[in-house]
Amino acid sequence: MPFKMSRAAYASMFGPTTGDKVRLADTELFIEVEKDFTHYGDEVKFGGGKVIRDGMGQSQATRVDGAVDTVITNALIVDHWGIVKADIGLKDGRIVAIGKAGNPDTQPGVNIIVGPGTEAIAGEGKIVTAGGMDSHIHFICPQQIEEALMSGLTCMLGGGTGPAHGTLATTCTPGPWHIARMIEAADAFPMNLAFAGKGNASLPGALEEMVLGGACALKLHEDWGTTPGAVDCCLSVADDYDVQVMIHTDTLNESGFVEDSIGAIKGRTIHAFHTEGAGGGHAPDIIKICGQPNVIPSSTNPTRPYTINTLAEHLDMLMVCHHLSPSIPEDIAFAESRIRKETIAAEDILHDIGAFSIISSDSQAMGRVGEVAIRTWQTADKMKRQRGRLPSETGENDNMRVKRYIAKYTINPAIAHGLSHEIGSIEIGKRADLVIWNPAFFGVKPDMVLLGGSIAAAPMGDPNASIPTPQPVHYRHMFGAYGKARTNSSVTFVSQASLDVGLAARLGVSKQLLAVKNTRGGISKASMIHNSLTPHIEVDPETYEVRADGELLTCEPATVLPMAQRYFLF
């Protein structure tokens, strides 16, 4: 006679199973388990009197025989491809299997072999996501990296050299000398890092030397002069060397309007930063570019989501970040031209329908590096409350909306920047850059962050206590963040061209240098998973009202948000 358990008892012991629903933090977002890859009655679980013991759930297999290095048991995976319950097997710092873990000598259907050399991470009742990627980083201070890691980010792409005024305003590392220093500095950090060179030039020579010097992308920024000539030149170099181009267009419309920038792009693939415009770009209608099939549009998180405080904080932020003076009327006019409640409200809806593809931070330069996940899920929650369930949802859940929003800071930036063969999702063969969450703290405070299969960060109690949990509990680096484990657990992404000319040997860095690939004609807006809509966008030049395919896009600002003061004292 099979043993029967109530759903509540089963979920308490092994985590939710098919058909069970889980609330994400304090939002109105509810996910439903679509499939359970574990086997009822043969689940593996670690602990006293539990299954993963010698001769039971643990086999005699050696590592050579196929035993994994780490098993995450009974995890609820939330990814762009599905919301499923499964065990996850990690080996050599990569995901090698998703399915049923255990001992094949005593259990059927095992595709993840647990052996004496296998570590166990208890995933029961936990959510596992791919590590987040922030593709809009101003490398103003190295302390950003710890902040990002502790929030669940495992890859940061952008530019800068520290608190130089060029870096305070623009996301680029100018010149091969600075790029080399940043790649060397990357060895010190438990984080996958990637650096963009400056893309503003009318002749290719200086851009080519940056790509050959290790830049994995080129950034066009209006503060360096984003003219049609610079746009064309930069994209031509990118096409030759297979690196992505990110663009921040001309707010003042000095060298042309949005149509001129679209013309200069000539249908080539490009990542458009803060496409709404508050972060910069042709005023007031840069948002129109999100309807172009070759443009990958993204947001930075200060405008995510639209709240009663959004407009008020932006003016001061903008004055500081772009080296403007409140005593110069032209500087104030420049700042005010970028801040429009109508386009910010429309941005919420464009994210919800999948027309904006990526959310990033704009770290310390009109953005908060530790709030990429929080702002993403706050936007999703606001849209559910204001717009209801997505028409594409099936069942009494928010699975489709959750898949759409998690893709915005995991797989889609990875695809856009040529990293998706390594990171961005929980798939076999990819790096084991994973984040484990308690559902009540989902998107806010991770339980554990893994880099290349090693635990790099986690909340930890008093090190002198008799158990790990006594106060003060706060985030601390773990062993994966120290010594050679740090440089063996994370990587630096560069151009293939730089590797071909011997960059690794020339710099002698400890981290592995990996090449970006397929950033040009092989991808487009259509490549953005769950976020590929290309509506025709119109902006009224006087009222700033935004329409998509003729429909007015507007919503009220939020007065209260989830994932906020309930979780933070400060």
Curated annotation (Swiss-Prot):
Subcellular localization, as worded in the UniProt entry: Cytoplasm
Classification via SUPFAM superfamilies: Composite domain of metallo-dependent hydrolases (SSF51338), Metallo-dependent hydrolases (SSF51556)
Signal sequence region: none
Classification via InterPro entries: Amidohydro-rel (IPR006680), Metal-dep_hydrolase_composite (IPR011059), Metal_Hydrolase (IPR032466), Urease_alpha_N_dom (IPR011612), Urease_alpha_subunit (IPR050112), Urease_AS (IPR017950), Urease_asu (IPR005848), Urease_asu_c (IPR017951)
EC number(s) on file: 3.5.1.5
CDD domains: Urease_alpha
Modification after translation (UniProt): Carboxylation allows a single lysine to coordinate two nickel ions.
Positions contributing to Ni(2+) 2 binding: 219, 248, 274
Superkingdom of the source species: Bacteria
Record key words, sorted: Cytoplasm, Hydrolase, Metal-binding, Nickel
KW Flavoprotein (keyword) present: no
Domain Urease, first and last residues per copy: 131-570
Entry similarity comment: Belongs to the metallo-dependent hydrolases superfamily. Urease alpha subunit family.
Self-association and partners: Heterotrimer of UreA (gamma), UreB (beta) and UreC (alpha) subunits. Three heterotrimers associate to form the active enzyme.
Name the UniProt record assigns to this protein: Urease subunit alpha
Organism per entry: Allorhizobium ampelinum (strain ATCC BAA-846 / DSM 112012 / S4)
Species lineage: Bacteria, Pseudomonadati, Pseudomonadota, Alphaproteobacteria, Hyphomicrobiales
